[in-house]
């Protein structure tokens, strides 16, 4: 399944070796749910992209990735558009949504693990690994932040892969290292450490059931059908998305 997904970036699976996979999603704290009267919308992304929800949550802190290449595909898919942003008008429409919620956003950050774990923010967009790490840290210190990592329709799926540069001098060692990371014992330990899903199926069998049964780490078949693969945006789409983001 991962190899099929990876073909969007590596046709024929000729070069890339997957070692981790995960989802881009959102998390909310107990305080955030309290401000919403304990009721979450059917579409969890509404929490992030509709002012009727962000207005209620701004007092406890909303955080977005400071990464347009991560945020725009999620928002485009939410709007029913091509996540690649191939149509400039689609990107502009997405930017208007971002403008509408911008006054309610407290922080733009590449990583929000600590802020979310402390309860400094109550709604965050991020990858499932970071969000689940924040949840684990919060539970470890028993600070009662009450983080829930949501699994709404339209999550973005990504794959981290190994590639060997064409001009690499130590190709044999590179292959040895890749094989080492794919060893079930090693891959399982790494997956547990970062709360990502190892690409190796035998590794998954060595991970705690609590993690394997967490859909924001190991999405189920329906999640996969309802989501999309994070795309490689064209140079023009990237440039426009960055320009719109900076505005």
Language-model regions: role of each:
Residues 160, 165-225:
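Mature extracytoplasmic/periplasmic domains
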Residues 46-49, 72-76, 95-98, 113, ...:
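Non-transmembrane alpha-helical segments in soluble domains
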Residues 123-143:
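A ligand-binding cleft/hinge motif common to bilobed small-molecule-binding domains
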Residues 24-26, 32-34, 68-71, 128-132, ...:
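Solvent-exposed loop/turn segments at secondary-structure junctions
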Residues 91-99, 142-166:
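Periplasmic-binding protein-like
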Residues 27-32, 76-80, 158-170, 189:
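A bilobed periplasmic-binding-protein/Venus flytrap-type ligand-binding module shared by bacterial periplasmic
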Residues 114, 221-247:
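Conserved C-terminal helix/tail region of periplasmic/extracytoplasmic solute-binding proteins
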Residues 1-120:
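Extracytoplasmic ligand-binding site segments that recognize negatively charged/polar headgroups
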């Amino acid at each position: 399944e991962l190899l099929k997904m990876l073909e969007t970036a590596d046709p024929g699976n000729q070069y890339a070796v997957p070692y981790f996979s995960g989802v881009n999603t959102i998390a909310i704290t107990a305080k955030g749910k309290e401000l919403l009267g304990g009721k979450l919308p059917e579409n969890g992304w509404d929490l992030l992209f509709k002012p009727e929800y962000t207005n209620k949550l701004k007092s406890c802190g909303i955080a977005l990735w400071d990464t347009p290449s991560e945020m725009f595909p999620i928002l485009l898919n939410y709007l029913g558009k091509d996540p690649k942003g191939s149509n400039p008008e689609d990107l502009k429409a997405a930017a208007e949504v971002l403008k509408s919620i911008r006054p309610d956003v407290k922080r733009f950050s590449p990583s929000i693990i600590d802020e979310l774990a402390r309860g400094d923010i109550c709604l965050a967009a991020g990858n499932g690994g970071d969000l689940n790490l924040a949840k684990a840290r919060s539970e470890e210190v028993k600070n009662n932040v009450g983080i829930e990592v949501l699994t709404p329709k339209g999550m973005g799926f990504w794959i981290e892969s190994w590639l060997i540069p064409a001009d690499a001098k130590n190709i044999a060692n590179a292959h040895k290292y890749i094989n080492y990371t794919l060893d079930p014992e090693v891959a399982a330990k790494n997956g547990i450490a970062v709360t990502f899903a190892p690409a190796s199926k035998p590794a998954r069998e060595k991970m705690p059931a609590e993690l394997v049964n967490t859909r924001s780490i190991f999405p189920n078949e329906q999640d996969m059908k309802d989501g999309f693969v994070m795309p490689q945006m064209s140079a023009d789409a990237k440039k426009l998305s960055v320009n719109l983001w900076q505005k």
